[in-house]
């Protein structure tokens, strides 16, 4: 019997396992396949260094700037060099392995090649997690069960904490890691917003490798085929200026869904279960970035689990501490606001977004608000919105 069983060893699950193990409790960390590279752009905010100071010792690709383009290619460029700590870009296969190993070093017991598919029940109560392995089915019993296995989690549905995602609640993305000579600014990441609800990105990974991809959002998923959108994006004449070669080596490619409306408030906990990371919607509705928010959710759930175990009471009363955790409250609030901004920005073929970039190039205050909204999911002020509306 474990104190805590966690399904999923991504950023949320690994941080949660680390926190609980450091608290002196017995924790099982289950993973379906540690060699699977999660499809992702791989941009990581410098805020993550607060939770993983070990990353500073690694040779990561530093990012000190961002270039954003509206659907009509109005540009907003921003650099935070010498202002704040650099962010960085990563290959998710390597990044996830690093933070997983940190949780194992802290004392978490890791079980790879275990596909979670249901709960273990006793007297109608969920007391563990069932998995499928090459050797057969296994059961991991725990006092607290934590769902951290992403968008496609079977446990999320079986727990009844949330229903299956519908197409109008998610984003659909496709990306690739490519290699070859390029003219990208290695210090900056680039975002290319479309006239419909969607955007593309190019993130340098080193001198020659880069992550390139795109996604559609919400109802745009119905009117746009992600495979066609991807081909259109990588062949966009505007992007050719960065890529002088005729062909580039494709190292890896993948498609993936992600939650697009923020955190599902009523899906965070119940009885002896908590849900964290992508499973619970910890992805920014406006940028699609989810690594930082997922790590915060793992930290909060880990602290909450320790609180419940220390008080020898595992119930809604003790687990509600997770939802009221200060940083979780902040993320929930900010994501709700930025989700509403998505509708506003994409009105009239993205005209409001284009106007914002135009204003940001002439008004320092507007520029700072715009950057904080995209990079840190900070809600805009009423003055900011009124300025944009006045340009319509």
Positions of predicted regions on the chain:
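N-terminal Rossmann-fold NAD(P) dinucleotide-binding loop
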Residues: 13-14
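C-terminal helical "tail/cap" subdomain of flavin- and related membrane-associated enzymes
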Residues: 306-392
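Predominantly flavin-linked oxidoreductase catalytic cores and closely associated redox partners
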Residues: 102-243
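N-terminal FAD cofactor-binding segment of flavoenzymes
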Residues: 32-71
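Glycine-rich FAD pyrophosphate-binding loop
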Residues: 9, 19-40
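Beta1/beta-strand and adjacent pyrophosphate-binding region of the FAD-binding site
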Residues: 1-10
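Short beta-strand to alpha-helix junction loop
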Residues: 81-102, 154, 220-225
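FAD/FMN-dependent oxidoreductases across multiple families
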Residues: 220-304
């Amino acid at each position: 019997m474990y104190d805590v069983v966690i399904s999923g060893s991504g950023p949320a699950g690994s941080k949660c396992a680390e926190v609980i193990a450091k608290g002196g409790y017995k924790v099982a960390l289950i993973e379906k396949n540690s060699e699977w590279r999660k499809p992702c752009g791989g941009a990581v905010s410098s805020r993550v260094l607060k939770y993983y100071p070990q990353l500073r010792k690694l040779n990561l690709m530093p990012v000190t700037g961002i270039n954003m383009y509206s659907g009509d290619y109005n540009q907003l460029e921003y650099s935070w060099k010498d202002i704040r700590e650099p962010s960085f870009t990563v290959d998710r296969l390597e990044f996830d392995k690093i933070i997983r190993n940190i949780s194992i070093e802290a004392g978490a017991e890791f079980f790879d090649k275990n596909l979670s598919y249901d709960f273990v029940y006793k007297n109608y109560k969920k007391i563990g997690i069932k998995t499928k392995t090459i050797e057969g089915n296994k059961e991991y019993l725990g006092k607290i069960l934590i769902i951290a296995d992403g968008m496609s989690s079977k446990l999320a549905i079986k727990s009844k904490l949330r229903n299956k995602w519908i197409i109008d609640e998610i984003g659909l993305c496709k990306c690739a890691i490519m290699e070859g000579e390029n003219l990208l600014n290695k210090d900056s990441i680039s975002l290319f917003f479309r006239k419909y609800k969607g955007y593309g990105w190019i993130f340098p990974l080193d001198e020659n490798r880069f992550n390139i991809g795109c996604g559609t959002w919400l109802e745009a998923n119905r009117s746009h085929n992600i495979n066609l959108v991807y081909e259109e994006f990588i062949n966009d004449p505007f992007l050719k200026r960065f890529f002088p070669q005729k062909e580039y080596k494709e190292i890896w490619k993948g498609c993936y869904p992600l939650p697009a409306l923020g955190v599902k408030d009523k899906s965070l906990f119940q009885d002896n279960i908590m849900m964290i990371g992508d499973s619970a919607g910890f992805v920014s509705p406006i940028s699609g970035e989810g690594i930082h928010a997922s790590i915060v959710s793992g930290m909060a759930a880990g602290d909450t689990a320790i609180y419940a175990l220390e008080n020898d009471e595992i119930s809604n009363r003790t687990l509600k501490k997770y939802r009221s955790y200060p940083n979780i409250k902040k993320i929930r609030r900010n994501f709700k606001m930025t989700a509403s901004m998505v509708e506003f920005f994409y009105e009239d073929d993205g005209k409001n977004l284009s106007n914002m970039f135009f204003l940001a190039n002439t008004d320092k205050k507007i520029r700072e608000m715009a950057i904080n909204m995209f990079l840190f999911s900070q809600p805009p002020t009423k003055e900011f919105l009124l300025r944009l509306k006045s340009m319509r």
